[in-house]
Curated annotation (Swiss-Prot):
Keyword annotations of the record: Cytoplasm
Protein's UniProt name: 14-3-3 protein gamma-1
Primary localisation category: cytoplasm
GO terms (BP aspect): brain development; heart development; protein localization; signal transduction
Cysteine-cysteine disulfides: none
Organism per entry: Danio rerio
Cited InterPro entries: 14-3-3, 14-3-3_CS, 14-3-3_dom_sf, 14-3-3_domain
Name of the coding gene: ywhag1
Amino acid sequence: MVDREQLVQKARLAEQAERYDDMAAAMKSVTELNEALSNEERNLLSVAYKNVVGARRSSWRVISSIEQKTSADGNEKKIEMVRAYREKIEKELETVCQDVLNLLDNFLIKNCGETQHESKVFYLKMKGDYYRYLAEVATGEKRAAVVESSEKSYSEAHEISKEHMQPTHPIRLGLALNYSVFYYEIQNAPEQACHLAKTAFDDAIAELDTLNEDSYKDSTLIMQLLRDNLTLWTSDQQDDEGGEGNN
């Protein structure tokens, strides 16, 4: 029998050593024990996979950029090598995302009780995130399917968070942040992205007195990120409008 506490301890240790693959493997084993995760365990799982997938997302972006430049050069051999390498990274990224999505569907979301709104929103947000990461590298029909799954997960989480969580709750705010990024980057819908981010920010500002001392830092950091995105996106839209006016 695997000792749950030992696995969690191993995950903490791996995090300190920045060995995120080991950390993810340990937390995957904890999740597969099929018992509800504590808040700390939930965060360990999230941090582990965020770093594992983050490394692949970063590599994919670098190689995609090189691929575009190489295509312009017209060196066939090099183009083929770069493409093959991008596809290798893509497969790794897809495997990681699928791992997380399986854990969410088979254990985490399934085991949320009727009143565990915070956990449910956390896991549905995570589901939206990992389908979004798949959408970043997918094309054609495959992309359409993962985009739809991402939207569905974010939307369900959003409804639950609005009904059961304070506007200043860091999980509700984090969901709004990522959902708005989904609209902006994946759906290419800047108006929806700005509306969602602005509403979340304004609602939180209006209820600043409900800020929990424990999560004050987290909440205010996410509010700052929402505001930064809004500033960037609205200036981008103005630039686009200006550009169109000049054509």
